[in-house]
Amino acid sequence: MKFSSIILLTLLICSMSIFGNCQIETNKKCQGGSCASVCRRVIGVAAGKCINGRCVCYP
């Protein structure tokens, strides 16, 4: 429950951002592959990439 509320709060803050450059860095490791399944599970959207060995999701 706490994890879900953190994600919702992050999305709320990101949606209010003037610049709209919001990204959510996960603790899931990756190697140049797609992070779509991780992002779909974390934020419900399949937009993400592998940056510095971690999945970064974009709402």
Swiss-Prot record:
Keyword list, A-Z: Disulfide bond, Ion channel impairing toxin, Neurotoxin, Potassium channel impairing toxin, Pyrrolidone carboxylic acid, Secreted, Signal, Toxin, Voltage-gated potassium channel impairing toxin
Pyrrolidone carboxylic acid sites (modified residues): Q23
Keyword set includes Repeat: no
SUPFAM superfamilies xrefs: Scorpion toxin-like
GO CC terms of this entry: extracellular region
Pfam families, sorted: Toxin_2
PROSITE patterns reported in the protein's UniProt record: SCORP_SHORT_TOXIN (PS01138)
Signal recorded as keyword: yes
Tissue expression summary: Expressed by the venom gland.
InterPro entries assigned: Scorpion_toxin-like_sf (IPR036574), Scorpion_toxinS_K_inh (IPR001947)
Protein location: Secreted
Positions bearing the site annotation: Hot spot basic residue in hERG blocking currents: K28, R40, R41
GO molecular function ontology, one term from the record: toxin activity
Cysteine disulfide links: C30-C50, C35-C55, C39-C57
Record-marked site positions (Aromatic residue of the functional dyad): Y58
Signal peptide annotation: 1-22
Domain notes per entry: Has the structural arrangement of an alpha-helix connected to a beta-sheet by disulfide bonds (CSalpha/beta).
Function: Blocker of A-type voltage-gated potassium channels of cerebellar granular cells. May also inhibit Kv4/KCND when coexpressed with DPP6 or DPP10. The occlusion of the outer entry of the K(+) conducting pore is partially reversible and affects both open and closed channels. It shares the same target in rat brain than BmTX3 (AC Q8I0L5) and AmmTX3 (AC P60208).
Family: Belongs to the short scorpion toxin superfamily. Potassium channel inhibitor family. Alpha-KTx 15 subfamily.
This protein's name: Potassium channel toxin alpha-KTx 15.4
Organism of this sequence: Androctonus australis (Sahara scorpion)
